C-alpha cells in the first residue's frame, strides 16, 4: 500500500517496477504495475531478492530491497515523501493555435530565432521570434517527420517521399514555392514505413534514415520492390521477420549533398527513429528494439558500415543477390555506441541533440540529449576509447509533467530544450501531444556529470562537491550484462552478474569517485546504481542515481583475465498467469490487442472465439510461440521456457471463450 507521508492519503497511479534475477523470464528482468485508487498494488514473483522501484508524480522516487519466500507473502505499507519542487529544471507546455492539429513531429529554429514545427498531417507552422505569433507556412505534405530552417524564409522538410524546400518568395509569411531537393529512395505506401530525420551539418549537407516496412499491404510502389533477405540461422532454420526492406534503401542512413546528390551511407538499421549531427559534424542515429536489435540503441554512423539488421544489404552493390549467413553478419556488425536498456531508459528513443547553449542549459555542455516515446529524456556522455565512441546513458528528466511521444528535439536561442510530441496514433495520449520545453532554472543540479572508463574500473564525476562519505564503496552497486544479437524481437539480458567493488575513494576535487572493480571484461553493459541517499556538500539530493555504460572496449593497460563471476540459472516454476500478464503486455499486446481479439491489419487471430487458437492443446500453442508462425516472430530465443508457460496461462485464463470480454 502506498501512502503519502504526513497525511496518510493513498497514492494512486504510481509506477512500480520489481526487478531481480527471479524475473529472468521477463524482459529486462522486471515487472511493472500501477497502484490503484486506494494505493494498493500486488506483485506475484518467484522467491528471491528483488529491487522495488516506486515512481509517483509529486513524490521522491523510492527503491526498496525485498526478499520473497515461498510460504510468507511480503506486505508493506510504504510512505512516499513529497518531492521538493524541481530546483534545476522545469517542464513547460508551449501554447499552440487552436486551428493547428497538435501531432507535432519535429521542431527547429531559424537563424533569426523563429520556432518552426511540422505535424504528421502535412503542415508547417512558424512562431515568430519577435511577436510570438503563429502562422501556417505550408500544407499538403505527406507525413513530415523532420525539419530544418536554413534561413528565416526557407524551410526544409523530410516527408515520406522526399526532402522538400519550402520558400517564401514574396515575403507574405507563407511558402509559395515547393521544390524537391531529393527523392532517391523507394516507397510502398505501407502503414509502417517512415522517413526519419532531418539533420544538417555545417557545410549544408542533410542527413536522415529510412525504417523497415512491416508485413502487410504495399498499395503502391516507387522504385524496385524486393522480398525479404533470407538469412539461415546457425541451426539451419529459416526465420520469419515481419520488418523488411522491400523498397530501395529502407534500413539505411543517408546523406544529401548541397547539390542535391543522394548518397546512401550505411545499412543495418531497423527503425532509425532519431537522426542527429554533432557539433563536430559526426552522424549519430538511434534505433528501436525488434528483430536483430536487442534493445534500443545509439549508433555512431560511418559510411560503409553495417549495424545489425541484414535486410537492407540487398541494396548494397556488394550483396545484391548474394547469400548472407548468420556468421557473416556477426563478423560485419559494428556494435552499438551505447545500449539504452528498455524500461528505466525508455522504449523508443528519438533524435539526439547536443547542448551547445554556452551554459544556458546547466552544466552539461557538449553532452547529448535524447527524447523518447515515453515521458523521458535521456542524457548521453560519450568518450573515445581506442579511437571509437562509447559511453554512458543516464535518465535526465522523467515525468515532471513531461508528455509522451517526444521523439524530435531542438535547443532554442533561449537555451531551453524544445520537444515535439506525437505518437502517430499508436496509443492514447489523453490530449498530451504538442510542444513542450525543458528550462533550466539557474540552480545547479546534483547529478553524475561523467561516467568514464578507467584501467581498473570507472570514475564518476559529480556536478558539485560531495562530502567525504561519498567515497564509500557501499554507496554503489555495479552489475554487468549482455544482450543477444539475433533475429528475435528484442532480447533479455544475459550473463547478468553483480560485479564486486574492491575499493573506492573520493578524489581531492571532492567531485570524482574512483571505483576499482574485482574484474573488468569488454563487450558488456555496466549498470551503476547509487544505492545510498547521497547529497552534495550544500545538502541537495542526487537527482538521478542510475547509469548504463557500454564498454565495447577497455583502456590500454587493463588486465583482462577469465571471469570468476557466473550468472546463476533460474529454476522453472509452475505456470502463473499473473506473471504472464506482464509478459503479454510487453511482448504480445501491440499485435494481439488488450482484449485478445487480434488485428485483421496485422494478421493476428481472435483468442476469444470458441474455435480460435485456444481450442488447441498447450503443446501445440507452445510450439507456435517458440517457433513463430505467419507474422509472429519466434519467441523461443527471446523468452525462456518459464515466460512461455506463464504467458500461455495468462492468455487461457483471460481470453478463453468462457471468459470472453464484450
Identify what each model region corresponds to.
Residues 83-445, 449-457:
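Beta-propeller domains with acidic blade repeats across secreted/periplasmic ectodomains
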Residues 409, 435, 580-594, 647, ...:
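The canonical Cys-X-X-Cys-His
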Residues 600-606, 624-662:
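Axial heme c-ligation environment in periplasmic c-type cytochrome domains
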Residues 51-66, 81:
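A short, solvent-exposed loop/turn motif at the edges and junctions
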Residues 463-503, 529-536, 545-549:
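Short, surface-exposed alpha-helix to beta-strand junction/turn motifs within ectodomains of secreted
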Amino acid at each position: 500500500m502506498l501512502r503519502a507521508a504526513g497525511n496518510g492519503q493513498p497514492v494512486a497511479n504510481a509506477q512500480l517496477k520489481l526487478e531481480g534475477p527471479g524475473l529472468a523470464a521477463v524482459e529486462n528482468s522486471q515487472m511493472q504495475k500501477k497502484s490503484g485508487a486506494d494505493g494498493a498494488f500486488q506483485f506475484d514473483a518467484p522467491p528471491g531478492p528483488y529491487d522495488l522501484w516506486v515512481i509517483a508524480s509529486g513524490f521522491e522516487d523510492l527503491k526498496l530491497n525485498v526478499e520473497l519466500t515461498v510460504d510468507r507473502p511480503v506486505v508493506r505499507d510504504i510512505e512516499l515523501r513529497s518531492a521538493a519542487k524541481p530546483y534545476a529544471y522545469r517542464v513547460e507546455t508551449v501554447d499552440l493555435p487552436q486551428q493547428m492539429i497538435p501531432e507535432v513531429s519535429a521542431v527547429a529554429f531559424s537563424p533569426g530565432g523563429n520556432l518552426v514545427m511540422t505535424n504528421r498531417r502535412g503542415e508547417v507552422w512558424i512562431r515568430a521570434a519577435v511577436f510570438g505569433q503563429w502562422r501556417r507556412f505550408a500544407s499538403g505534405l505527406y507525413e513530415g517527420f523532420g525539419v530544418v530552417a536554413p534561413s528565416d524564409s526557407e524551410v526544409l522538410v523530410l516527408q515520406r517521399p522526399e526532402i522538400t524546400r519550402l520558400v517564401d518568395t514574396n515575403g507574405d509569411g507563407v511558402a509559395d514555392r515547393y521544390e524537391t531537393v531529393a527523392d532517391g529512395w523507394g516507397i510502398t505506401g505501407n502503414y509502417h514505413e517512415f522517413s526519419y530525420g532531418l539533420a544538417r551539418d555545417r557545410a549544408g549537407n542533410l542527413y536522415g534514415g529510412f525504417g523497415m516496412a512491416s508485413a502487410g499491404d504495399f498499395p503502391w510502389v516507387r522504385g524496385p520492390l524486393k522480398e525479404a533477405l533470407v538469412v539461415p540461422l546457425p541451426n539451419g532454420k529459416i526465420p520469419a521477420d515481419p520488418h523488411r526492406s522491400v523498397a530501395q534503401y529502407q534500413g539505411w542512413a543517408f546523406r544529401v549533398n548541397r547539390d542535391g546528390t543522394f548518397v546512401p551511407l550505411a545499412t543495418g538499421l531497423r527503425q532509425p527513429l532519431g537522426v542527429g549531427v554533432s557539433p563536430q559534424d559526426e552522424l549519430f542515429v538511434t534505433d528501436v528494439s525488434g528483430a536483430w536489435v536487442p534493445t534500443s540503441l545509439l549508433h555512431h554512423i560511418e559510411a560503409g558500415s553495417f549495424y545489425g539488421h541484414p535486410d537492407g544489404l540487398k541494396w548494397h552493390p556488394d550483396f545484391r543477390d548474394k547469400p548472407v549467413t548468420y556468421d557473416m553478419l556477426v563478423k560485419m556488425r559494428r556494435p552499438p555506441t551505447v545500449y539504452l536498456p528498455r524500461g528505466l531508459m525508455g522504449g523508443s528513443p528519438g533524435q539526439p541533440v547536443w547542448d551547445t547553449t554556452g551554459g544556458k542549459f546547466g552544466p552539461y555542455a557538449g553532452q547529448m540529449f535524447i527524447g523518447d516515446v515515453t515521458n523521458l529524456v535521456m542524457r548521453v556522455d560519450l568518450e573515445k576509447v581506442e579511437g571509437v565512441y562509447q559511453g554512458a546513458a543516464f535518465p535526465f528528466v522523467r515525468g515532471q509533467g513531461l508528455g509522451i511521444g517526444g521523439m524530435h528535439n531542438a535547443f532554442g536561442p533561449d537555451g531551453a530544450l524544445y520537444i515535439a510530441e506525437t505518437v502517430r496514433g499508436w496509443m492514447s495520449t489523453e490530449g498530451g501531444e504538442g510542444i513542450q520545453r525543458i528550462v533550466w532554472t539557474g540552480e545547479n543540479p546534483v547529478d553524475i556529470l561523467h561516467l568514464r572508463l578507467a584501467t581498473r574500473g570507472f570514475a564518476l564525476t559529480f556536478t558539485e562537491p560531495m562530502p567525504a562519505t561519498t567515497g564509500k564503496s557501499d554507496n554503489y552497486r555495479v552489475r554487468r550484462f549482455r544482450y543477444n544479437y539475433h533475429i528475435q524481437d528484442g532480447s533479455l539480458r544475459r550473463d547478468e552478474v553483480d560485479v564486486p567493488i574492491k575499493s573506492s575513494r573520493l578524489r581531492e576535487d571532492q567531485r570524482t569517485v574512483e571505483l576499482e572493480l574485482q574484474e573488468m571484461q569488454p563487450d558488456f553493459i555496466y549498470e551503476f546504481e547509487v544505492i545510498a541517499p547521497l547529497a552534495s556538500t550544500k545538502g541537495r539530493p542526487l537527482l538521478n542515481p542510475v547509469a548504463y555504460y557500454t564498454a565495447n572496449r577497455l583502456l590500454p593497460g587493463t588486465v583482462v583475465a577469465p571471469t570468476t563471476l557466473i550468472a546463476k540459472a533460474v529454476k522453472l516454476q509452475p505456470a502463473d498467469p499473473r506473471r504472464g500478464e506482464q509478459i503479454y503486455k510487453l511482448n504480445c499486446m501491440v499485435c494481439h490487442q488488450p482484449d485478445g481479439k487480434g488485428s485483421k491489419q496485422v494478421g493476428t487471430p481472435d483468442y476469444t472465439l470458441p474455435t480460435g487458437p485456444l481450442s488447441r492443446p498447450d503443446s501445440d500453442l507452445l510450439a507456435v510461440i517458440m517457433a513463430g508462425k505467419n507474422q509472429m516472430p519466434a519467441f523461443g530465443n527471446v523468452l525462456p521456457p518459464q515466460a512461455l508457460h506463464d504467458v500461455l496461462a495468462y492468455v487461457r485464463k483471460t481470453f478463453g471463450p468462457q471468459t470472453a470480454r464484450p
